[in-house]
């Protein structure tokens, strides 16, 4: 499974 980078909520 390819882990996707967690996006930081603004």
Curated annotation (Swiss-Prot):
Coiled-coil region: none
Keywords assigned by UniProt, alphabetized: Membrane, Mitochondrion, Mitochondrion inner membrane
Gene encoding the protein: COX8B
Function description: Component of the cytochrome c oxidase, the last enzyme in the mitochondrial electron transport chain which drives oxidative phosphorylation. The respiratory chain contains 3 multisubunit complexes succinate dehydrogenase (complex II, CII), ubiquinol-cytochrome c oxidoreductase (cytochrome b-c1 complex, complex III, CIII) and cytochrome c oxidase (complex IV, CIV), that cooperate to transfer electrons derived from NADH and succinate to molecular oxygen, creating an electrochemical gradient over the inner membrane that drives transmembrane transport and the ATP synthase.
Name of the protein in question: Cytochrome c oxidase subunit 8B, mitochondrial
The organism of origin for this protein: Ovis aries (Sheep)
Tissue/organ expression: Liver and heart specific isoform.
Membership in a protein family: Belongs to the cytochrome c oxidase VIII family.
GO biological process, one term: oxidative phosphorylation
Cellular component, GO annotation: mitochondrial inner membrane
Highest taxon in the source lineage: Eukaryota
Localization in the cell: Mitochondrion inner membrane
Main localization category: mitochondrion
Pathway it works in: Energy metabolism; oxidative phosphorylation
UniProt membrane topology term: Single-pass membrane protein
Assembly and binders: Component of the cytochrome c oxidase (complex IV, CIV), a multisubunit enzyme composed of 14 subunits. The complex is composed of a catalytic core of 3 subunits MT-CO1, MT-CO2 and MT-CO3, encoded in the mitochondrial DNA, and 11 supernumerary subunits COX4I, COX5A, COX5B, COX6A, COX6B, COX6C, COX7A, COX7B, COX7C, COX8 and NDUFA4, which are encoded in the nuclear genome.
């Amino acid at each position: 499974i390819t882990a996707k980078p967690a996006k930081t909520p603004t």
